[in-house]
Amino acid sequence: MGARASVLSGGELDRWEKIRLRPGGKKKYRLKHIVWASRELERFAVNPGLLESSEGCRQILGQLQPSLKTGSEELTSLYNTVATLYCVHQRIEIKDTKEALEKIEEEQTKSMKKAQQAAADTGNSSQVSQNYPIVQNLQGQMVHQAISPRTLNAWVKVIEEKAFSPEVIPMFSALSEGATPQDLNTMLNTVGGHQAAMQMLKETINEEAAEWDRLHPVHAGPIAPGQMREPRGSDIAGTTSTLQEQIGWMTNNPPIPVGEIYKRWIILGLNKIVRMYSPVSILDIRQGPKEPFRDYVDRFYKTLRAEQATQEVKNWMTETLLVQNANPDCKTILKALGPAATLEEMMTACQGVGGPGHKARVLAEAMSQVTNPATIMMQRGNFRNQRKNVKCFNCGKEGHIARNCRAPRKKGCWKCGKEGHQMKECTERQANFLGKIWPSYKGRPGNFLQSRPEPTAPPEESFRFGEETATPSQKQEQKQEPIDKELYPLTSLRSLFGNDPSSQ
C-alpha cells in the first residue's frame, strides 16, 4: 500500500481528493482508487509505476484507448481513473471525471493535428504509426519489435488460470494491441494444452480466410511498380506472408491493417470457445434467496461476456434481466429505484439484503404498519372490514357484551328467562338427535331423559264416594300398564325416547 500511495505528493493528493467521480455527485476520488488502478494494471501485465508521472499515464491511456469499445466496465473505469490522474500530474484544473476526459480528448486532437501538419511539411501525407510493436527508428524506417517474453508469460498464465473463461478475450485484446499476424501466431503457439479448443480456433480462422478471399478477389493483370500485392486470407493469417510484407501492408498508404483483421478473426473464434467452455445462458443467471447482490452481479456480467451478441443487445439484457432475475427482496428495491438507476446505485441500495440486519428492518417496518386490529383482520383474510353490532344478554342493549354490562345481573336464564339454569345449559329450541327442532308444547325433546315425577296428591278415585263401573276397554288398559312397567323399566330405551310420535 505504501508504494502505491507514493504515486501522488501531498499537494497532488489534495487536488486528487477534490475531484468528483460524476458531475454533481457527492463521491470524490480517494487513495483507494489509485490502489485499485495499480492492481488492475498488474493484471494486464502493465507496470503500475507508470502512474507516478504524466508521461507514464499518457502511455497507459494510449494502450487502453483502443480497447474501450470492446472492453468491460472495469476497463472503462480504469481508463477514467488514469485520465483523471494524468490531469492531476499536469496540474490541469478539473472538477470531475467528465472534464478530465474532455481535456484528454482536446490534447489528443491537438497532437494529431500537429502530427498531420508535420507529415505534410515533410511531403509525407501518411500518418506515422506509433503502434507497438511496429515503431519508427531514428532513420525514419518502420521496424518491428518482437513481442516481449513478459507479455507471452502473462498470456500463458491467463490461459492456465482462467482456461477459456470470458475474461480471456479482453486480456488477449489488451496484450495483442498493434501486433502483427506473426506476433499473434506466436501468442497462439505458446498455448500448450487445450488442443481441442485450438483446433476449433483454427477452423474459425480458415472459414474467415475463405470468406475474405470470396469478398476480395484478386485483380487481373500485373502489379504496378512500387505497389504491394493485395493480401489473401492466408496472408492475413500469417501462413503465406513474410514479416516485411505484413509491416508493409500495415504502414502502407492507404494501410491494410492485416494485424487487426487477423485479431478480429481470433476473437471471433475465442468467443465460440468461451461459449463452449461456459454453457450457462444469461437467461439462467438468477440470484439466490440468500446470495449477496454483488456476487449475483459478478456472475451476471461474467456470463454476459460470453454471450455472442451486439453491444445494443447486451445493454438491453443488462437493463432488463439484471432486475428481472434478482430475488424478490432485491427486485422490490430495484424497481423502486427506477429504470434510470446506475449500477453503483443498485449495488448500494441492495447492500446487506438477505442478512440479519435487513430482515430485522423489514420485520420492524411490517410491525409498525400493523397498528390497529382492523389491519390484523385484513391480513388474516377478513377483507369485509365490517364489525357486527354486539348485543348484551343482560340488559338487551347494543354496543357491549354481558361481561362488561354495568346493569344489575338478571336472574335466571338469559335465553328463556326461567330460573334454575344458565344460558349455556338452556334447552330451549334445542335440536334432537335427528337435527330437528322439538316443539316446546310437546314437553322435553326425545333425546333427553323422560323423567316423569310421580304425583304427590292421592288419585282422583280416592276422593269419590261411589264407584263407577269401568268399561271393558278401561279394564284392558289398566291390565296393560303393569305389564308395560315390568317389560319397560324407567332406564330402558322407552324411557329415553318416550312415546314414538310416528306411531301415534
Curated annotation (Swiss-Prot):
A motif (Nuclear export signal) lies at residues 16-22. Residues 476-487 have a biased composition (Basic and acidic residues). The modification Asymmetric dimethylarginine is found at residues 387, 409. It comes from Human immunodeficiency virus type 1 group M subtype B (isolate JRCSF) (HIV-1). This is Gag polyprotein. A zinc finger (CCHC-type) spans 390-407, 411-428. A motif (Nuclear localization signal) lies at residues 26-32. Coiled coil: none annotated. Late-budding domains (L domains) are short sequence motifs essential for viral particle budding. They recruit proteins of the host ESCRT machinery (Endosomal Sorting Complex Required for Transport) or ESCRT-associated proteins. p6-gag contains two L domains: a PTAP/PSAP motif, which interacts with the UEV domain of TSG101 and a LYPX(n)L motif which interacts with PDCD6IP/AIP1. A motif (LYPX(n)L motif) lies at residues 487-496. Gag-Pol polyprotein: Specific enzymatic cleavages by the viral protease yield mature proteins. One of its GO terms (biological process) is viral translational frameshifting. SMART domains: ZnF_C2HC. HIV-1 lineages are divided in three main groups, M (for Major), O (for Outlier), and N (for New, or Non-M, Non-O). The vast majority of strains found worldwide belong to the group M. Group O seems to be endemic to and largely confined to Cameroon and neighboring countries in West Central Africa, where these viruses represent a small minority of HIV-1 strains. The group N is represented by a limited number of isolates from Cameroonian persons. The group M is further subdivided in 9 clades or subtypes (A to D, F to H, J and K). GO terms for cellular component: host cell nucleus; host cell plasma membrane; host multivesicular body; membrane; viral nucleocapsid; virion membrane. Keywords: AIDS, Capsid protein, Host cell membrane, Host cytoplasm, Host endosome, Host membrane, Host nucleus, Host-virus interaction, Lipoprotein, Membrane, Metal-binding, Methylation, Myristate, Phosphoprotein, Repeat, RNA-binding, Viral budding, Viral budding via the host ESCRT complexes, Viral nucleoprotein, Viral release from host cell, Virion, Zinc, Zinc-finger.
